Structures are given as structure tokens and as C-alpha cells.
Amino acid sequence: MPPTADHGDKLSGKVALITGAANGIGRAIAERFANEGASVVIADLDNQTSQSVVTHIRENGGRADAIVCDVSQARDAERAVEHAVTSFGCLTTVVGSAAVFSPVVPIDELSEADWQRAIDVNLTGCFLISKYAIPHLKTSRGTITLIASQMAQVANAGQSAYCATKGALVQLAKGMALDYADAGIRVNTLSPGGIATDRLAKRFGNLEQAQRIWGPKHPLGRLGEPDEIARGAVFLASDDSTFMTGADLLIDGGYTAW
């Protein structure tokens, strides 16, 4: 697919496995990667929506496939990696985007089950998908990008579990960056601010309410758009960032600058 105003070639020849890519930021990353020439595998529990994303990408000239995946389960993570390699011949890029919010309550009101679910999906999910991808990424000298959050840097009341998992992701990426630098694998995190997604709309009631309440907390005065995060993910997966590993790319509208 030749470069156009909507399509580029920054990721031409790349094969990307993206978790949590049926909706929100993950979907935007999958679509932007495909627009930049990557072959994309969507790994998500929501198979129906995943297939609609695949159809959309293919209808726009891209290459995509999907697999049902619970990232908190080792066998699912392993199968997702195998599926990507079988479908497209190799694996060069992993993006860990699957995540869950926890109930907004202080720790003494948070159930152990909700705490464990946050750990299992947000943190263990990225560990597992990375673990099984790394043997293939050693061959391709590829990249891993874990989607963290501005909440890895600053905290919000009632969100201790979410903040803890996202902060841990940043440290996980730094550790892996050191472990695999000699193998040519680059590992970074990307930390969004408040982004206008369906998940955020559900949390606030609707996007207008989210924008009214949370938008002003960002110095730029608004929520970000999913594609603004996706463009950052393209940068981290591309040859534009070849001297970048163990870093956290903040795209947060200035949220952490207050």
C-alpha cells in the first residue's frame, strides 16, 4: 500500500501483536499501525468487535487478523504469539494495551478480587505477552511498548490499584529494556493522559461529562484523542526511535506538569 495522506510506510514490513485492541486506545493503535504498513494481530476477549476492526483494516487496504485472548492466562498469551507468527511469518512488534479499571474506592473498601483482577490484567498480562514474544523478538530485533498511564507518575484518590499496576509497568519495561538490550530488543512504555474513549465515557456517564470534569485537569484544556496516542505508539515501534529504550513516553496534555 503506497503512502498517501492517510497511509504511510513507517512500519512497512512490521508484524505487530496488539492486546486489548478491539476498542479504545488499542483499536486506534491497531488501525494506525495498519495505516503505516504493519501487519496487525488483534488479541482481545471481545471477538465480535475484534473481527469488525479486522474488517475495517482490510477494507482500507491493510493486513490484519484477530485471536481471542485473555492476557491474564499464560496459554492464551502463548497462543496469541503463535497465531501472529503463523499468520504473518514473524513477529517484530508487541503492544500491551489490555487493561481494566478498578472500582473508584479507597483501599479498605476495595475487594481482594478487584485488586487481583487489576494485577492479573494490567501487569501480569503484559508480563505474559512479553515473555512468549521475546524469543521471536530476539530474531527480529523488535520492540515492546507497554501502555501505562499518567497515573504511573501521579496518583488519583480511589485509584490505588490502577496506579500501582501502571507504575509497575514502567518498572517492568525498564527492567526488560536492560535484560534484552544486547539482543536488540527495545522496550518502552507509553503513558496517556485522559483519552476520549468509550470506557472513559462509561465511567463519567458520557464523553461530554468526561470532557467537562476531567478535560480542565489537563493544561491543554481537553481530553486527548485515541489516535494521538496511536501516533506515539507508531514512533516507539518505528525506526524513528532506534536510540530509545527503557523510557516512558508521556502523552498527557501536560497533566503531570501541574
Predicted regions and their residues:
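Short C-terminal tail/terminal secondary-structure segment
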Residues: 1-8, 12, 101-104, 154, ...
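A glycine/serine/threonine-rich, flexible loop-to-helix segment
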Residues: 3, 182, 194-218, 228
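Alpha-helical segment proximal to the catalytic Tyr-Lys
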Residues: 135, 178-182, 242
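Residue(s) in the substrate-gating loop at a strand-loop-helix junction
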Residues: 149
